[in-house]
Amino acid sequence: MPETDEEKVRRYTECLMNGIDPKRALKRLYDLNVSPEVFKSADTYQCVKRYESSPELAKYAKRVRDKLLGGRKREKGGGEDDADIEHTALKKAKKEEVNLDEEFAEAMKSGVSAQASSAPRATVDYSKYKVVKRVEVKVEPKPEPVDVHEQQASSSSMSYQREHQKDYAPVVPTCKPSGQPKKAIPQSKSLHADENMFKPRKERQKVFAGRRKRVGEGVSTLVSLCQTVLMSHIDMIDHVGIVPFDLLKPVLDHASTDQLRHILDVNPMLVEDADEMFHEMVSREFPKYANREKSGWTWREMYDRLVEKKQKKENDKLEMLTSRIGKSNSAQSQGRQTMVIDMAHTRVRSKSFFNTVKDSQVKMSATPSALQLSQARKNVKIEGKAQLRTITPRGGGVPSTSRSRSNNNNNMNNGLVVKKTAPLMAKCKKMLKR
């Protein structure tokens, strides 16, 4: 179904009311040919009037307004015709007065020209041109046509405009001019930031650490003064007598756990009231146990039990750590160690030989030193083999292979270990024999 003109008027009026593309809506309303009753039912005049103050949309709004007012004039007809007749009558009276003035001026000119030309003066009746006091005719301004619907909906539209003011239709403030001078607009501190930057440091505001002391805010009561003194000397609190708990509670809130226990031990009448303080301590340090129901125990006992359990757990953990650290240090201290041996082995043997030597507990003889060998080498030719045999260990000669094998086998059978000459020593002996 195509949209009717009435529906279009309502749709464009809603667009103007909500501020949705007002320029297009004003153009479409101007192009529509609809009776004024349709515009009146949709309250289009009020919506158009809002855009007359906008600099961009004032031209289109005035065109639509003139169109709406023109249609209403044609409807009213009779009442406005009477006003037009009165207005035309006033215009005619004014024109007649202007014509009389013009005739008088022409007559005066004609008289002057006649005297100059010395022509016979014509008889002119100047009585009708006698200047009298001009009657001032007050022309009343033409009253603007006021719509009946506008008067009815004035209150509702004004309230709606106040609640829903748009950015494109600013409200011009109506203020009466006053003779008093205007107050200076306070400037922000950021404008003077550059000026303060180039000033010396002495003029700048000093910065202090900590909280600002509250001095002179008000006169404190005697009770509050006493409480502040007690807060700074909690260790000196002893038996308080019949002082109510409400006065001591602000002081006890600042006390440590040991101080609170000492005060409660001295003043047993405060134990029941102070049990809630231990409940708060449990909820703060051990939140898992805060919602338990009391059954024959107090919150102080619960707190002491939990603290003891926590300390025991920490001590066990500390002992475990110390034992681990001690073990690690002892393991690190066992590194490479040097062993001092008094007597070196005569010959280099295999591991199996040393194991057998250990088992058989055979004593090893010391090898000859280099000095002894050098002396023996010098005296070989003189003293001969006898001296060399005295220096070298027993059996130092180089035996034959067959003989040595048979001797070894016999000795092994007897349970004795035969010492073999080292290859380097055998080589030295061969050289000495030569």
From Swiss-Prot:
Please verify whether the record's keywords include Kinase: no
Compositional bias segments (type: Polar residues): 151-160
Compartments annotated for it: namely: Nucleus
Extract the ranges annotated as region (Disordered): 142-161, 391-415
User: Which gene produces this protein?
Assistant: tceb-3
Q: Which domain of life does the UniProt lineage start with?
A: Eukaryota
Q: What is known of its domains?
A: The BC-box, which mediates binding to the elongin BC complex, has the consensus [APST]-L-x(3)-C-x(3)-[AILV].
For this UniProt record, the keywords arranged alphabetically read as follows:
Nucleus, Transcription, Transcription regulation
Official protein name in the record: Transcription elongation factor B polypeptide 3
| InterPro entries reported in the protein's UniProt record | Elongin-A_domain, RNA_pol_II_trans_fac_SIII_A
The F-box domain, residue ranges: 237-281
